[in-house]
Regions:
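Short beta-strand "acidic-cap" motif of Rossmann-like dinucleotide-binding folds
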Residues: 1
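S-adenosylmethionine
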Residues: 4-120
Length: 120
């Protein structure tokens, strides 16, 4: 579990199951291609959340975005393609992105850039 707020991490450390790891930090600072799954809920608009989460996941892994009814799946799919992934499933309320190759050079972008200049 990754969160930029120390207060939330302390709470998670107390209540997380023993097989879960809590990391205090930002997605842009984490190891590339190191995790099997990343799940994002209320992190950012779905295309930005995809850009932050996909570099964390290794080839063959998945990113699960918890989204609202107005999420633009086509836009998220375009972003995913640029970061070596594809839109695999769309169960109600979620978008599942499957990582198809290692993270390309240039990702994750510098801190704040995804929000300032989102991928179209």
């Amino acid at each position: 579990m990754l969160d930029a707020e120390r207060r939330k991490c302390r709470f998670l450390e107390e209540w997380a199951p023993p097989n879960a790891r809590v990391v205090w930090g930002r997605a842009e600072e984490q190891e590339r291609d190191g995790y099997g799954v990343a799940v994002a809920k209320a992190l950012a608009p779905p295309p930005i959340a995809a850009e932050w989460c996909l570099p964390l996941v290794r080839e063959g892994g998945a990113v699960v975005l918890w989204v609202g009814p107005t999420a633009d799946a086509a836009h998220v799919a375009r972003v995913a393609e640029q970061i070596a992934a594809e839109l695999a499933e769309q169960p109600p309320g979620f978008l599942v992105l499957r990582k198809t190759a290692p993270t390309p050079p240039g990702f994750p972008r510098r801190m704040g850039l995804a929000r300032k200049r989102p991928i179209e």
